[in-house]
A protein has these predicted regions:
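Metalloprotease/metallohydrolase-associated module, dominated by Zn2+-dependent proteases
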Residues: 6-13, 135-193, 210-257
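Catalytic glutamate of the conserved HExxH
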Residues: 197-209
Length: 257
């Protein structure tokens, strides 16, 4: 295993994250040094808020273009740091955000043996040139890796029937009724299942760092790249296993520790 230490940054505005359980899970799985830190965006100066605000997305159908953030945008960054949900639905270019965060990682920790995993409520997106638009992403896999709790909820799609029923009436009453009807079939904000699902994304981040491959196309694998909430809940909560290929890969990684 190339990694000698994993530093995971909590997102305290999302109380469903059982950070101590995640720490134990990582230690039991990889037998490596694991350190938990508070939110990466907590107790930071305005320079970080300004840099992060500059990674915001304004045009969903155009590649990323940097801009100079306004004071209002910087204030929104401060506000979102205190809220469990990305209430303003601000979108961030995931790769630009990753580059920004990497500049504020302590110099003595910027080496190939220390993997930083940032948990955040910020909604990360990447531009897809196949359809020329941005898509929400739960994981930006590199070092530091970013795992978006909002992305886990928003990126994998809800059942098709959910959207079809919602199209007939967008009122709050109808939305609440539909959400109640399909409750349990997808992750919601303040969902107690979120922490366990997070473990799977952390495994994907580690796999990407170790092998350059984060996802699997096999639905029976915990590394499966789920496009639907149903698939996500199955791979991370019901199945919770690796396919034979990735089971072997993880054993090799662990044996190299």
């Amino acid at each position: 295993m190339k990694i000698s230490k994993i530093i995971i940054y909590d997102e305290p505005t999302v109380p469903e994250i059982q950070i101590n359980r995640i720490e134990k899970f990582l230690k039991d799985t990889f037998h490596t040094d694991v350190e938990v830190r508070r939110s990466f965006f907590e107790n930071v100066n305005d320079e970080i808020f300004q840099k992060v605000a500059s990674t915001r997305i304004f045009e969903l159908k155009k590649p990323f273009s940097k801009h100079i953030p306004t004071e209002l945008e910087i204030q929104i960054e401060r506000k979102n740091t205190d809220n469990s949900q990305n209430e303003e639905k601000v979108l961030y270019d995931g790769f630009e955000l990753q580059k920004t965060i990497s500049k504020f990682i302590p110099t003595d920790e910027q080496n190939q043996n220390v993997l930083h995993i940032i948990l955040t409520n910020k909604l990360t997106c990447t531009f897809d040139e196949s359809d020329f638009r941005y898509h929400a992403r739960a994981l930006i896999g590199t070092n530091p890796s970013i795992i978006s709790t909002t992305g886990i909820i928003e990126a994998p799609a809800k059942p098709k029937e959910y959207y079809l029923e919602l199209m007939t009436d967008f009122s709050k009453e109808k939305t609440d009724e539909i959400n109640k009807k399909y409750k349990g079939e997808f992750l919601e904000y303040n969902d107690p299942r979120l922490s366990e699902v997070l473990e799977g994304y952390i495994l994907q981040a580690i796999m990407y760092y170790e092998t350059g491959e984060a996802f699997c196309e096999n639905k029976e694998c915990r590394l499966y790249n789920a496009h639907w909430q149903k698939e996500l809940l199955y791979s991370q909560l019901k199945n919770k296993k690796f396919c034979s290929k990735h089971e072997e890969s993880f054993r090799k990684i662990i044996n190299q520790s």
